């Protein structure tokens, strides 16, 4: 079944999705147990470079847009360029989420794990809203799709390789700068599994949201 709803509703839902996802990144980062795989490299750089997590995310994801341009060349179009404002907005909402959550830092390990899980849930819900809106992709997902389509590799396979490469890059950066592993911990592994799991759980909810948008 195809769904057709106004661009205004889609845009509003998309912004809500970016906001919720940004807060999810902040919630999964604040406990200090690591963060989601795609955010692990930007997060580790913040321990070395005096910039915010949002800015680090923007800078590093710009390379994924550049990589798409290199692969596609003349076929690089507006739908790929649209990833730039999406990235800028997401970076802003990550920093907004970090500001919003700075007032509460969990003390016990149980509370830190709990906040990590809640952050994964927020991130999954935010991604779900973005999928419903279907306006633009984040540069990382855009890069994965381009590689999948151009080289005829299943999207899921490319996603696993991409996330693994980001985490490995974060570990290498950490070892080179700090001579130990910083910023990549059990929370990174938890996020790698839980975000995808929560997205699968909310498939029925996503369909209901689509139906509501038709009203």
Label every model-predicted segment.
Residues 1-215:
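Core subunits and conserved enzymes of cellular information-processing
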